[in-house]
């Protein structure tokens, strides 16, 4: 009985923590081998949000500013208490080397594909040592940051946990 009560209290406190959020945030960061890159964005609000007023920005290798081709305007609508998964657009099953396709497991999770041509836009080509920013365009407000802008932790990423890994935001992190 005590375990059941503890579990119920834990679930209630987790729900209340999410209730404290009032802005979009990066809920999952996937930096897999080769082109297996994705960002999941969570909408903790009670309203659907049109993503055309938001963008992802990549601050490459310790840069203090994102270049124009490292910023991508998002699309789609995130329903209340739901996510959209943005995946690097490498879908050609015959692609090799730099054009290798994302793995089927990741492709199945994709809601929206981004940045198919590196030379045109490479915001989704992060590699474990780049900071990623979710920004609202109309207000220029930074809603969330993954990593540290202006810091290059080396090719292994922050404490060797960001390169070739998937990171999921812990439920108790609300700001």
Predicted regions located by residue number:
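Short, Lys/Arg- and Gly-enriched loop/turn segments at beta-strand edges
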Residues: 91-109
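Structural recognition of the beta-strand scaffold that forms the well-ordered cores
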Residues: 25-28, 40, 55-58, 83-87, ...
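Sec-dependent N-terminal signal peptides
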Residues: 3-15, 19
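Conserved beta-structured recognition patch
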Residues: 112-175
């Amino acid at each position: 009985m005590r375990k059941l009560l503890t579990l119920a209290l834990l679930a209630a406190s987790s729900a209340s923590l999410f209730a404290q959020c009032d802005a979009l945030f990066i809920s999952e960061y996937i930096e897999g081998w080769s082109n297996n890159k994705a960002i999941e964005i969570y909408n903790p609000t009670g309203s659907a949000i049109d993503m055309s007023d938001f963008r992802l920005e990549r601050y490459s290798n310790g840069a203090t500013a994102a270049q124009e081709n490292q910023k991508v305007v998002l699309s789609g609508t995130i329903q209340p208490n739901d996510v959209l998964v943005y995946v690097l657009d490498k879908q050609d099953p015959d692609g090799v080397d730099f054009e290798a396709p994302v793995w089927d497991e990741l492709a199945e999770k994709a809601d929206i594909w981004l940045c198919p041509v590196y030379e045109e836009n490479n915001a989704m080509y992060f590699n474990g040592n780049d900071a990623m920013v979710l920004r609202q365009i109309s207000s220029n407000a930074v809603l969330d940051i993954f990593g540290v802008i202006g810091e290059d932790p080396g090719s292994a990423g922050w404490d060797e946990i960001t390169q070739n890994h998937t990171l999921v935001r812990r439920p108790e992190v609300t700001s």
